[in-house]
Amino acid sequence: MAKARNINRPLSPHLQVWKWGPHMLVSILHRVTGSGMATVGVGVFLWWLGALASGPESYAKFLDCLTVESGAPNIIGYVLGIGLTLSFFQHMMTGIRHFFLDAGAGYELKGNKTFAVLTMVVSVALTAALWGWMIYGELAKAPKTETPIAVEKK
């Protein structure tokens, strides 16, 4: 059986000098958030759709898993909601970053690192702004609408 690497051959120089950077983290986060949104987001959507189609009792159980009596999210609802929102904004901001990279801009090392860090900061800021608006802003003051299926909580 052959060895994995011939020690008599030189190692490519670029493999000896690389350092971990924010641009690498953003690239990995882009893949993770895309997969996470596809898996978790579609799973929750299909769960909601199945509960909606199965009738009032199934829909009430779905709501009980994600909300409290007032209709506000419970801890599971907040974790899923904030997690999916952060994933969405991170994926979107990284997509915008890739758009500029595809156009040939932002390949200078300092600019690339700055744009990578900015991508993460802006995605967290957008998530915080959206959830702040939903919890404390105009959306919180909006009148509550009825659910698609009349659900009586027992």
Predicted regions and their residues:
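Membrane-embedded alpha-helical bundles that constitute the cytochrome b-like, heme-associated redox core
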Residues: 1-154
